[in-house]
Amino acid sequence: MLDKLEFTENKYEELSIKISDPSVMANQNEWRKLCKEHAELETIVTKYREYKTNKEELEANKEMLSEETDKDMKEMIQEEIKTLEESIVKDQEELKILLLPKDPNDDKNVFIEIRAGAGGDEAALFAANLFRMYTRYAERHGWKTELMSANETDIGGFKEVVFMLRGDCAYSKMKFESGVHRVQRVPDTESSGRIHTSTATVAVLPEVDDVDIQIDPNDIRVDVFRASGHGGQCVNTTDSAVRMTHIPTGIVVSCQDEKSQLKNKEKAMKVLKARLYEKAEAERSASISADRKSQVGTGDRSERIRTYNYPQGRVTEHRIGLTLYKLEAFLDGDMEEVIDALITAEQAEKMKAMGNN
């Protein structure tokens, strides 16, 4: 581990020199790339230097202890040694985590697709609850929400809603949300008070750069139509809505949120690229042996990941066996405890995998 940390620190120092070089700064694309790499290394280098300082102070205190004769001073030094040893152990654990392989998509914006599953109108209302939960979570982080498309029901639910979250490391937080979400509650229309179970499916896709995926324009068919609102009635007198089909895969994307057909085309293309990227990643992951797949969650849309139980005020995260009795706050965007626990579980898996290798 120390060899890797030394290499990282040397690389960081080299980059520090490069990004201050006027000749490098003249090439803005190259300079931005180096600045990004420099910023990514800064956290680990700062922690490594803190670790080295603590090690040096520990050795100095041990030397002082061996030479000290005063009882009170020896007790003070021993206390300092104990504190430093605890700090060093903590530093080592943090450095192990910082050295874990980074998901290349973690710092990207995300597209989130929510689709009502089993349960009819109640499932559509639950899809709307999830949409609000994610947008409230985004607000807490200062992220921006951009609606891409929505198929609303007459009672305020969503058969399907697609939106984008723009913000710092959005994918690193939201990637665990892919899968089947289940709700247990008494619908407003249920006169007997019987609890119903409904589901909604969530897919989380990282925003894709043009360099990540290339699409042949000849492989795309674009159809335009008039945007519709509740119940399917037309809300626009021009053909501004766009349906984009990727012919080789059959993937279809619709976008009607903007009044401009051009803007809807741009949005639809972004979502299409994200879906094609996800498809390619899924095919790549399928080739990995089963024992290496993440136990935190495969990201499979068919995987049941979480239950929201209204009568008990309970949220249960099935992948890590975590249950919280704070349903109302959770649905208002207070998701941090679960997301942090999922991140910790993923880190533990990666550390275990590194140990096995």
From Swiss-Prot:
Q: Name one GO molecular function term.
A: translation release factor activity, codon specific
**InterPro entries linked:** PCRF (IPR005139), Pep_chain_release_fac_I (IPR000352), Pep_chain_release_fac_I_sf (IPR045853), Prokaryotic/Mito_RF (IPR050057), RF-1 (IPR004373)
> Would you identify the family this protein belongs to, as annotated?
Belongs to the prokaryotic/mitochondrial release factor family.
Q: Name one GO cellular component term.
A: cytoplasm
SMART domains named in the record: PCRF
User: Which organism does this record belong to?
Assistant: Clostridium novyi (strain NT)
**Protein name per its UniProtKB record:** Peptide chain release factor 1
Among Pfam families, the record links this protein to: PCRF, RF-1
Location within or outside the cell: Cytoplasm
Q: What does this protein do?
A: Peptide chain release factor 1 directs the termination of translation in response to the peptide chain termination codons UAG and UAA.
Any idea which residues bear N5-methylglutamine here?
Q233
Q: Region (Disordered) spans which residues?
A: 284-305
What are the protein's UniProt keywords?
Cytoplasm, Methylation, Protein biosynthesis
Q: How is it modified after translation?
A: Methylated by PrmC. Methylation increases the termination efficiency of RF1.
Decide whether keyword Protein biosynthesis is in the record.
yes
